[in-house]
Structures are given as structure tokens and as C-alpha cells.
């Protein structure tokens, strides 16, 4: 499967690095999309290569979506092309994994009303206001959406997402 990450500078390093390598280990093709080509750097200094820009992404070419957290989602959610990619993939039932602040992109996409999920506790109110039944759990699976809270939840998050991709 082809898996797309939507992110930008100041991503939470382990929330991108771990799923990136875990999904490659499972045999998936993994692509990172951001505002510009080149490299982006996480909050703790880890840099990754950007494969394509948001405006070059065709959501039809991807099978699943990952939304890491950190500070990046605050900026990504302001990019209409990135939000439309997330909206389309989520609405079409493609597997979507979000962690920490990653759901901010889905909130902006307007796709979470009536869904059950989790996030970083600091955006709990935003999730509830978007219509999410927010649960304080290491991982929540609701149909095509797998959500988690913080880096300590990474293993459970990817375990459930990998199951969804099979």
C-alpha cells in the first residue's frame, strides 16, 4: 500500500519516525508531503526528506494517511490543499491514523462529527466541539480512523493501524 504523511516543520519527531519505519517494515511505500520540497525538521532536531508538496498530491494515488503531531498540524490545517486531501481520504473510508495534535487537520476538514477518538489532552475541547466522542485511551479505533494521544501510545497506535491495513 501507498501511505501518505501530511506534516511540516516542528512535527513531533518520534510520532513521524516510528510509524514511518514501522510501515516500511511492513512492506508499505511511505511518502511525506509538506509545504515545500527539501527537508523538514522535527521539534527535537530530526530531519526528513519531503517527497512531494501538498499541491502535487493526488489522494487517489494513496491508500492510507498518517497525521503525526507536534506543532506541525497547527500550520498544516491552514493549508486548504492539505485539508482537502485529509477530507477526501477520510471520507472515502481510507485508513487514517492520527496522534497527538494530528487530529487538528481532521477537525479543519470537518469529518469528525459523530466519531469516537482520542488526541493529546490539550485539544480535547477542540475534539469535543468538533463532535468527537473523546476517550482517554492509548488507542481508539472507529471504522477507518485510528487515534492515539502521546508518544507513549505509539506501539498500540501502530499495532492497530497495521491491522487495519491488512
Swiss-Prot record:
GO terms for biological process: proteolysis. The active site is at 100 (nucleophile), 101. One of its GO terms (cellular component) is cytoplasm. Coiled coil: none annotated. PROSITE patterns: PEPTIDASE_C56_PFPI. Residues 1-166 form the PfpI endopeptidase domain. GO terms for molecular function: peptidase activity; protein deglycase activity. It catalyses: N(omega)-(1-hydroxy-2-oxopropyl)-L-arginyl-[protein] + H2O = lactate + L-arginyl-[protein] + H(+); N(6)-(1-hydroxy-2-oxopropyl)-L-lysyl-[protein] + H2O = lactate + L-lysyl-[protein] + H(+); S-(1-hydroxy-2-oxopropyl)-L-cysteinyl-[protein] + H2O = lactate + L-cysteinyl-[protein] + H(+); N(omega)-(1-hydroxy-2-oxoethyl)-L-arginyl-[protein] + H2O = L-arginyl-[protein] + glycolate + H(+). Its EC number is 3.5.1.124, 3.4.22.-. Its main location: cytoplasm. The keyword Cytoplasm applies. Gene3D superfamilies: 3.40.50.880. Keywords: Cytoplasm, Hydrolase, Protease. It is found in: Cytoplasm. Belongs to the peptidase C56 family. Homohexamer formed by a dimer of trimers that assemble into a hollow ring structure. Deglycase that catalyzes the deglycation of the Maillard adducts formed between amino groups of proteins and reactive carbonyl groups of glyoxals. Thus, functions as a protein deglycase that repairs methylglyoxal- and glyoxal-glycated proteins, and releases repaired proteins and lactate or glycolate, respectively. Deglycates cysteine, arginine and lysine residues in proteins, and thus reactivates these proteins by reversing glycation by glyoxals. This is Deglycase PH1704.
